[in-house]
Amino acid sequence: MNDYIVVKCGGSMLDQLNDVFFDCIKKLQQQYKVVIVHGGGPEIDAKLKDCNINVEKRDGLRVTPKEVMDVVQMVLCGSTNKKLVMNLQKHNLLAVGCSGCDGNLLQVQPVSGEIGYVGEVSYVETALLKGLINMNYIPVIAPVGINDNEIYNINADTAAAGIAAALSAKELILITDVDGILHEGKLVKKTDESEIATFIEKGVITGGMIPKVQAALASLKMGVQKISIVNGTKDFTEDTGGCIGTTVTRGVSIV
């Protein structure tokens, strides 16, 4: 059991996770070293609304001035992270919640002054993750990072990709509420960058699936070898250790 698997669960999925999801994590943990990265978009939006703070996004990234960063940190590092940790432990999966600023886990470079405290992963302190895993804990990571003693918001997809690349993970699994990419009603089991571009152009991939495949493509560019888009509300694991869903790699034809 030497290979790492990184599981990214978006904020919109956290309230949909059921016993099947946690059973899948148990099965993955029997064969791999598992790290979980979560988002928290809907809860952040709700809290900002409660605080009468405007929600603004540019090119898929949350505009994060200081007052927004305070809320992001409170939600991601607090309630969202701890709910997921407690849910894992309710299902007999030992977990430790931490953020990217704990132990300098995720160091970042600012994306742009125009969008405030938003960073891209520049360094991952993998020793911390490996230490937790060696003690049989699942690290559950809130996607904030640190630069020059300031905390930055990180897009959860890019945080997960950065961690997967740093760990040379065998796979990055993106948890969604659909079975994967569908073409003419059938699941596309394997695809690559060029085919995804064609699918988007032809309207095969639309709506909420577009940001998911864009996250997969960005992950490939960061060095992740394989990304699986799976339905977290169903059993997405195979007995062989693979995933049931759409697998995105470099230069692979559709099967």
From Swiss-Prot:
Which keywords fit this entry according to its UniProt record?
Amino-acid biosynthesis, Arginine biosynthesis, ATP-binding, Cytoplasm, Kinase, Nucleotide-binding, Transferase
Cysteine pairings via disulfide bonds: none
Q: Which GO terms describe its cellular component?
A: cytoplasm
Q: Name one GO biological process term.
A: L-arginine biosynthetic process
Which residues does the annotation say bind substrate? 40-41, 62, 153
GO terms of molecular function:
acetylglutamate kinase activity; ATP binding
* Recorded superkingdom: Bacteria
Q: Where's it mainly located?
A: cytoplasm
According to its UniProt entry, the function of this protein is described as: Catalyzes the ATP-dependent phosphorylation of N-acetyl-L-glutamate.
Q: Fetch the PANTHER family from UniProt.
A: N-ACETYLGLUTAMATE SYNTHASE (PTHR23342), N-ACETYLGLUTAMATE SYNTHASE, MITOCHONDRIAL (PTHR23342:SF0)
Q: Which family does it belong to?
A: Belongs to the acetylglutamate kinase family. ArgB subfamily.
Name of the protein in its database record: Acetylglutamate kinase
**Gene name as annotated:** argB
